[in-house]
């Protein structure tokens, strides 16, 4: 079995060097000195009985307890250029540029046009702090020499042999030679980031050359180059831990910006737009995995586009299962390549055109489960799409294709598909509103390869005449067709007294051609009519006030509503191979045809919905706040398209958010009749009773659903702050139906003053076998990107 431990130890070299930083400078005197009552030195020099006719430059003032004149003035030489003036005790130097300096002694030399400050020197300007034993102020340039000073600005402090300030693209940049950087603001810091040269971009990043991480008197990590941003997406990240199927592991990520041009003086990439995150992960049970993620930072992050992710691992044990499901024929060569991008290529005053890509190539069906379980839980079968899109204020048009790059899960293809949606808008300058949806495409759906192979093997083993053979044949039949679908709807909002009435009428057609399998081509015509009626009542409650519960007067709003929806269409035969079809859910279906995405499952329906919304609104933060909302409704089926019901459940959707430390969400549905209906309760509550304790509890009950499994699940999360240093977090998930504690997770947090650390441990019961994991978190408080993250939930 291959064990690439050598690569691991080459990455993290531990050095035993005892080279200490220079002895820390003595703490400066308090920075709260008040301006003394004495006259500034310029007033003294204007006194003709004691000084020549010279003055400090305009905008410079020096104060001190004692003034002494030295140099040629005391020898009878009245040359102003030889004058030396000493200030002793509680020195304060001010300039009109905002610079302030404090020291024990100031020596002004008019010959050299300098002021020598010494003894507990502190310089302040633009939020920056310099500290040291001496510094020289130039009277002509009104600037200080910062050699052998310590520089401090949030969140770092810098000690260096020399520091110089330059301006790059309008920003102040500091270049320090033989530098030591820390965020631990004490006389004897617990750690230093050392380098031969450090370039500091305040509020952005630090670039190190010949970097050492030093804790105490030990060099812990050396790198020839490190660009360490204050942004958590960049810089170095390390995550050690362990998990049953992965073994012990250390995940390493290093993020840097690419693109742009390098500045020769600062080493910064100007105009860099491509964020790259490089991964090198070592697993004792899997081997070495390496990859890179690229993010286009020019795109809006909210769009969810703009990255390329590549990862590969030569798996030492690819058939080790995680959830107790046997694996066979899984090759060691495991990888993932994901490209998600939107490339705008044309923009007009009314429209924007772009090329969109969303592609994911996986080596096998278990890759996401092993190496990206957080994505696996929400999207275990990623789509693959390429297309051109046109967006305008009133419409969305797309010509694209859905590909089948991964044959190990069931998916459909669209080669190609054209869609055009008109949003609801006025029709020809009339009160009528119009909306429509049109799509045309060639569609196919295929089973996963392992499913086809399994069914084919089962069919080959059957005896002649076995009824199971026909069932398998139907499952193995190719499913596909060419489909044209269009639907158009008009609506007319009407105000009738106290009532809001919105009638809607729509019609459409769906045509299937080139149908694969036993079915013939077919056309379907859809006719739909709807009417929505609602009204509102409200009552002002000015005396309903409570500081404890966040109420400053209230208004109670009641909104009764009803909706009648009718659809008539040609039904498809039950054997027809539907592609855009319904999936099981416990929530009510969408009953507006234009928003009904399961086009192939459109069926006749007649449904009346009756409901009432209640809102209790109060004043908060110069605005209005929904203190309590409740929506209660049910459906009466004149014709039920799915389950032949007379009535749906009675639904209640409740949200209560009275104060920031309390939130309650509750969704319930109970049978109105006793015929084939189910019960569901889904609730969650977050409560922070005091500053040191917070918990969140959720409960879900599902019973007698026709498709979904019964469930009684409790989820509990807590965080307790024991004191200024210790905190404990927990997460438990319990399934009461089979009395299974599905997840136990425990996190311990400790504040090390300059560092923060956490350790987490979890046990997951997969019913067939247990899974264990552990991870650690260690980071510098003020530099979140230089840390070890804890991501128990993602594992």
Regions found by a protein language model. Name each.
Residues 4-13:
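Bacterial N-terminal signal peptides
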């Amino acid at each position: 079995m291959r064990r690439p431990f050598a690569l691991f130890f080459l990455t993290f070299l531990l050095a035993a060097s005892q080279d200490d930083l220079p002895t820390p400078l003595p703490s400066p005197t308090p920075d709260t000195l008040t301006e003394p009552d004495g006259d500034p030195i310029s007033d003294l020099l204007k006194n003709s009985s004691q000084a020549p006719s010279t003055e400090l430059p305009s905008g410079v003032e020096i104060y001190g307890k004692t003034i002494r004149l030295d140099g040629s003035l005391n020898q009878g030489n009245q040359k102003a250029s030889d004058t030396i003036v000493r200030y002793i005790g509680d020195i304060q130097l001010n300039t009109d540029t905002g610079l302030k300096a404090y020291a024990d002694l100031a020596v002004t030399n008019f010959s050299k046009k300098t002021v020598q400050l010494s003894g507990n020197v502190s310089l302040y300007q633009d939020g920056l702090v310099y500290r040291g034993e001496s510094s020289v102020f130039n009277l002509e340039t009104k600037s200080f020499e910062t050699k052998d000073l310590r520089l401090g600005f949030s969140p770092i402090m810098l000690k260096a042999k020399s520091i110089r300030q330059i301006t790059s693209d309008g920003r102040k940049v500091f270049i320090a030679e033989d530098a030591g950087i820390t965020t631990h603001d004490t006389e004897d810091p617990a750690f230093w980031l050392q380098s031969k040269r450090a370039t500091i971009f305040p509020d952005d990043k630090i670039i190190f050359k010949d970097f050492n991480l030093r804790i105490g008197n030990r060099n812990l990590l050396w790198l020839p180059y490190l660009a360490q941003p204050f942004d958590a997406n960049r810089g170095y990240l390390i995550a050690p831990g362990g998990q049953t199927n992965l073994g012990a592991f250390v995940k390493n990520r290093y993020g840097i910006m690419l693109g742009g041009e390098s500045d020769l003086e600062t080493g910064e990439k100007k105009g860099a737009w491509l964020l790259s995150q490089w991964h090198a992960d070592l697993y004792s049970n899997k081997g070495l995995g390496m990859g890179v993620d690229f993010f286009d930072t020019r795109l809006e992050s909210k769009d969810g586009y703009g990255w390329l992710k590549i990862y590969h691992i030569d798996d030492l044990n690819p058939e080790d299962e995680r959830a107790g499901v046997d694996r066979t024929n899984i090759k060691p060569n495991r990888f993932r390549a994901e490209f998600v991008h939107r490339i705008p290529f044309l923009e007009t005053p009314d429209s924007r055109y772009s090329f969109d890509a969303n592609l994911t190539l996986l080596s096998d069906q278990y890759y996401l489960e092993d190496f990206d379980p957080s994505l696996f839980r929400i999207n275990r079968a990623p789509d693959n799409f390429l297309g051109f899109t046109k967006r305008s204020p009133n419409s969305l048009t797309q010509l694209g294709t859905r590909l089948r790059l991964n044959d190990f899960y069931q998916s459909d293809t669209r080669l190609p598909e054209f869609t055009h949606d008109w949003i609801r808008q006025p029709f020809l300058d009339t009160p009528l509103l119009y909306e429509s949806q049109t799509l045309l495409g060639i569609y196919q759906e295929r089973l996963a390869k392992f499913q086809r192979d399994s069914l084919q093997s089962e069919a080959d083993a059957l005896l002649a005449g076995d009824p199971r053979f026909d069932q398998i044949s139907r499952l193995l039949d190719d499913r596909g067709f060419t489909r044209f679908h269009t639907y158009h709807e008009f609506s007319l909002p009407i105000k009738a007294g106290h009532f809001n009435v919105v009638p809607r009428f729509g019609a459409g057609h769906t045509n299937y051609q080139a149908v694969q399998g036993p079915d013939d081509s077919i056309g379907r015509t859809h006719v739909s009519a709807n009417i929505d009626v609602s009204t509102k009542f409200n009552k002002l409650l000015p005396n309903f006030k409570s500081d404890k519960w966040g109420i400053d007067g209230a208004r109670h709003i009641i909104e009764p509503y009803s909706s009648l929806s009718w659809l008539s269409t040609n039904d498809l035969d039950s054997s027809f191979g539907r592609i855009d079809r319904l999936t099981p859910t416990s929530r009510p279906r969408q009953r507006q045809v234009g928003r009904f995405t399961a086009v192939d499952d459109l069926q006749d329906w007649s449904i009346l919905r009756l409901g009432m919304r209640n809102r209790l609104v109060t004043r908060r933060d110069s605005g209005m706040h929904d203190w309590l909302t409740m929506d209660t409704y049910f459906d009466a089926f004149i014709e039920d398209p799915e389950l032949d019901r007379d009535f749906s459940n009675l639904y209640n959707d409740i949200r209560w958010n009275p104060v920031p430390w309390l939130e309650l969400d509750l969704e319930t549905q109970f049978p109105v009749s006793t015929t084939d209906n189910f019960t569901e309760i889904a609730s969650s509550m977050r409560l922070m009773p005091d500053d040191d304790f917070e918990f969140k509890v959720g409960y879900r009950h599902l019973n007698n659903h026709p498709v979904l499994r019964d469930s009684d699940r409790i989820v509990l999360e807590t965080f307790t702050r024991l004191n200024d240093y210790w905190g404990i977090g927990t997460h438990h998930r319990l399934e009461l139906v089979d009395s299974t504690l599905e997840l136990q997770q425990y996190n311990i947090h400790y504040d090390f003053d300059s560092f923060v650390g956490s350790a987490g441990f979890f046990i997951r019961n997969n019913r067939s076998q247990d899974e264990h994991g552990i991870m650690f978190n260690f980071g510098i408080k003020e530099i979140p990107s230089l840390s070890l993250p804890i991501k128990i939930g993602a594992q």
